Amino acid sequence: MKQPGTIYEAIGGFDTIDTLVTAFYTHVGNHPKLIPIFPDDLTETARKQRLFLTQFFGGPKWYTEDRGQPMMRRRHLPFEITPERRDAWLACMDAALNETKIEEPYHTAIFEKLTMTAHHMMNTPYK
């Protein structure tokens, strides 16, 4: 049996990313700490997240093809990302990972990679 070469392949590819992002933005759209920094219509935000996570976890480089180099910190600088919002974002992602039923060791690997990224995105101290 061939072992998957990437997290993307191991979790089932784009269909799983799509399910994860859909679940995630359902939580984001209802989270009082996150609503102020996200648009009312999350359609385009979710589309970009699908492209990013596909690439981030070893799938096709769709994000770069569509948007250029990720430069995620720079792209997020216009938004106040506090430790509190980082934690809210991670809580929404953890809930989405649970709902998507991504199995171990991939659930933990994904959450750890996204936790490091979320820490990197912080640009505003506690208020």
Give the residues covered by each predicted segment.
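Core of compact, soluble alpha-helical bundle domains
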Residues: 1-127
